[in-house]
Amino acid sequence: MNNMNLYSVIKRRFLILTVILVISGCSHSISNDEKRLQAIEQAKPVYASNAIRLRITAVPQLNVFNNMSNSCTILIAQAEKREQLDKLLANPVLLRNLFAGTGATEQILQLDNYVMMPGQSVSLHIDRAEQARYIALIAGYYPAPDNTHTRVLSLPLRLEQHGWWNSAWSAEFVPMRINLTLGRYAITRSDFSAGNTGDEVVFPGQIVFPGQTAESGSDESVLRK
């Protein structure tokens, strides 16, 4: 075999090897993404004490009715599925009863409430309920809560990748921080964050509302602190 033929054989084998590596790399990428999503879906929503850290600030002209400021009760509801909270928010009678302390809480894992006064700021540490994946914040503005008075948030997960070539992913629920501002007639700002510097954090299926910061994320967005 002359040098030219030998060169052609080596070149052809090199090209074949390159194609195999590219195909293998693509397959690995897809498999890695699937492992990542699987880790998110299989994360166990365990109970955690003080895992929801809520900072609420009310303006002095809070919940104005007949030109007078009023108190405003905040309900904090936790559920396993978002549709369970959506169903609650779509039922004005049930909401009214919950604010009155007489409503049933079927499918709601935990319900907390706090009465905010005009001009008040408060920090609350709330336990994360076992099986909870979503939280709803409902402000009791007059005459009744609507979509400008509510926020539904997914509880955050921290992702970690293990290994390099055949990597594995793990995900665990982590504490979250929420800053809520109650305006004259509606919630005017809601920021949420989680994790520490360098963490990869996701809020699965999160919907962004007007008034949230860019740090809040969007559908399955990744936050790097």
Language-model regions: role of each:
Residues 73, 77-147:
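Structured domain cores in non-transmembrane regions
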Residues 22-25:
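C-terminal motif of bacterial Sec signal peptides marking the signal peptidase cleavage site
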